């Protein structure tokens, strides 16, 4: 490996919108996420199986207003 060209890795706390915090090694200083394994329906649904939709930006509602619920 060439010296002096690689970014410095550091331990960073990643903060989720649900309040959970995870620690990772990364080159980025600050990371904020919308969904993590503590709040994502895939991990929290308890194996119910249905359709899981995570919509934090209102895209599903915009689609339903435009095309209706029967699409």
UniProtKB/Swiss-Prot annotation:
GO BP of this protein: translation
Cofactor info, note text: Binds 1 zinc ion per subunit.
One Gene Ontology CC term in the entry: ribosome
Record key words, sorted: Metal-binding, Ribonucleoprotein, Ribosomal protein, RNA-binding, rRNA-binding, Zinc
A molecular function (GO) term: rRNA binding
Ranges annotated as spanning the membrane: none
Keyword set includes Oxidoreductase: no
Cofactor: Zn(2+)
Binding locations of Zn(2+): 16, 18, 36, 39
Keyword Ribonucleoprotein: yes
Family of the protein in this entry: Belongs to the bacterial ribosomal protein bL31 family. Type A subfamily.
Subunit and partners: Part of the 50S ribosomal subunit.
Function description: Binds the 23S rRNA.
Protein name (Swiss-Prot/TrEMBL): Large ribosomal subunit protein bL31
